[in-house]
Curated annotation (Swiss-Prot):
It comes from Histophilus somni (strain 2336) (Haemophilus somnus). It catalyses: uroporphyrinogen III + 4 H(+) = coproporphyrinogen III + 4 CO2. PROSITE patterns: UROD_1, UROD_2. The keyword Transport does not apply. Homodimer. This is Uroporphyrinogen decarboxylase. Substrate binds at R27, Q28, A29, G30, R31, D77, Y154, T209, H327. One of its GO terms (biological process) is protoporphyrinogen IX biosynthetic process from glutamate.
Length: 354
């Protein structure tokens, strides 16, 4: 059993008492750090960085050297699974992801292999093992995956999209084909996340970045149903610890009750949700993570501290809150801002845990 020097993040996810509110940042290993840019340049390109365990470890640890963060998150990408399925992933300079072979018919779905996490995705597991070794038990390591719906949007659209016309066309005209794809992706995600847990991650998160573009019934049917399947299939205890599961649907504030009923341990919230209202709705069932607008980090230190204090007050007394941004940190925020943010969370949250 690994004894963590700081297990505040895991305790908060399980709604157990903590001394202060834990904090980490989505995309905390990333382009806002000059040392990240240098390491990525050394790797050559983004996927080469992901595939090199030592360099992926280095960028995972970089933000922890600068800021007093309560968790590390594996440096990887949500599109590793479709890439391992053979869709030909590439990232152009200054562009989003593109797939050379998008999915557009039933036989394409049927022919998709489910990747073996210790074969096609072994580079991810090697990174997990390397990071765990180098963390030396300082803080927990978070593993993650994209949700089936979100992965499917990229696979069907062939890359990023604003209108999601191709996948919505499939959803309304060929729903059986889309369900077949989503079911296969859910199976792949379960294998992938369980392999990450066996390799050493101590909590997992499912990112449903594009669930918020769906209508109410469609969200339940095409996104949440498959996240529920994933939650049911995950290893929930490892190395003497519970392995908490967080679900995050960007734009998912309407569906918190349904999300909380999946059996997950926590919900990620974006900044459109009032934390006090979210706590009243589902705080008796799950912990909450979030939810400061990442753009607040463009503001003055005093304004950042004010926003942190407001969000802490919204959640109020007790455990069950992991402070985070409502989405990933922007790459051009002032260098001082993340430190002001992280330190403010710790400083001002002690009052709420006495």
């Amino acid at each position: 059993m690994t004894v963590l020097k700081n297990d505040r993040y895991l305790k908060a996810l399980l709604r157990e008492p903590v001394d202060m509110t834990p904090v980490w940042m989505m995309r905390q290993a990333g382009r806002y750090l000059p040392e990240y840019k240098a390491t990525r340049a050394k790797a050559g390109d983004f996927m080469s960085l992901c595939r090199n365990a030592d360099l992926a470890c280095e960028v995972t640890l970089q933000p922890l050297r600068r800021y007093d963060l309560d968790a590390a998150i594996l440096f990887s990408d949500i599109l590793t699974i479709p890439d391992a399925m053979g869709l030909g992933l590439s990232f152009g300079v200054g562009e989003g992801p593109k797939f050379a072979r998008p999915i557009d018919n039933k036989s394409a779905v049927q022919n998709l292999p489910i990747p073996d996490p210790e074969q096609e995705l072994q580079y991810v597991m090697n990174a997990v093992r390397t990071i765990r070794r180098e963390l030396k038990g300082e803080v927990p390591l978070i593993g993650f995956s994209g949700s089936p719906w979100t992965l499917a949007t990229y696979m069907v659209e062939g890359g990023s999209s604003k209108a999601f016309t191709k996948i919505k066309k499939m959803m309304y005209s060929e729903p059986k084909i889309l369900h077949l794809l989503l079911d296969k992706l859910a199976d792949a995600v379960i294998l992938y996340l369980n392999a990450q847990i066996n390799a050493g991650v101590q909590a997992v998160m499912v990112f449903d970045t594009w669930g918020g573009v769906l209508g109410h019934r469609e969200y339940l049917d095409f996104s949440l149903q498959y996240m529920h399947k994933i939650v049911d299939g995950l290893i929930r205890e490892n190395d003497g610890y519970k392995v908490p599961v967080t679900l995050f649907t960007k734009g998912g504030g309407l569906w918190l009750e349904a999300m909380a009923s999946t059996g997950c341990d926590a919900l990620g919230l974006d900044w459109t949700v009032n934390l006090a209202e979210a706590k009243a709705r589902v705080g008796h069932k799950v912990a909450l993570q979030g939810n400061m607008d990442p753009s607040v980090l463009y503001a003055s230190p005093a304004r950042i501290e004010q926003e942190v204090q407001q969000i802490l007050a919204d959640f109020g007394q007790g455990s069950g809150h992991v402070f985070n941004l409502g989405h990933g940190i922007h790459q051009d925020v002032p260098e001082i801002s993340p430190k002001v943010f992280v330190d403010a969370v710790h400083q001002y949250s002690i009052f709420y845990h006495q």
